[in-house]
């Protein structure tokens, strides 16, 4: 989930499917947001305007609330009213965080790429620099995140989500 704030100070909460790590130094992640009929989504508009956002990792405990944020609301309406999420102040950005998220990243806009197909812009790729991160103490052990404790959910396409499944550990060659 991404929280962002509009120029009118409306808190926007939105799910996203296309999210990845770009680099650890500097810590940058990417988020790709599809356009709807060529128009910027509210999240994209907000981030391009404020240069800030907060990324939250969805887990088994909050996936149903996260799904509610996919509602198509008019500009100026907040998805928060559809959820049981609790907004809390962030430390490094002016965008509220969601208390219930076990992992969240406070980010600033590092770069923006308009992705074109046949001359039309179909998506916006945002490169977001992590300024602060928060990891719940009960899922962080000996410098590692406990994947079972996190119980992360992945947003797929349409109505589908997936849980992180079976892990395979393979030693790397020296």
Question: In which residue ranges do the predicted regions lie?
Answer:
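Basic, polyanion-binding surface patches
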Residues: 1-174
């Amino acid at each position: 989930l991404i929280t962002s704030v509009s120029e009118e100070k409306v808190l926007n909460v939105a799910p996203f499917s296309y999210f990845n790590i770009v680099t650890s130094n500097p810590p940058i992640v990417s988020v790709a947001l599809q356009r709807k009929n060529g128009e910027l989504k509210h999240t994209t508009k907000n981030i391009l305007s404020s240069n800030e956002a907060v990324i939250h990792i969805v887990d088994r405990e909050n996936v149903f609330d996260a799904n509610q944020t996919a509602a198509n609301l008019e500009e100026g309406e907040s998805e928060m009213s559809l959820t049981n999420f609790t907004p809390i102040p962030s430390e490094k950005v002016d965008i509220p965080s969601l208390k219930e998220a076990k992992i969240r990243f406070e980010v600033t806009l590092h770069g923006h790429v308009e992705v074109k197909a046949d001359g039309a812009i179909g998506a916006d790729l945002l490169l977001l620099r992590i300024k602060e991160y928060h990891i719940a103490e009960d899922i962080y052990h000996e410098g590692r995140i406990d994947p079972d404790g996190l119980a992360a959910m992945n947003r797929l396409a349409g109505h589908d989500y997936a849980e992180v499944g079976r892990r395979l550990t393979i030693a790397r060659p020296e």
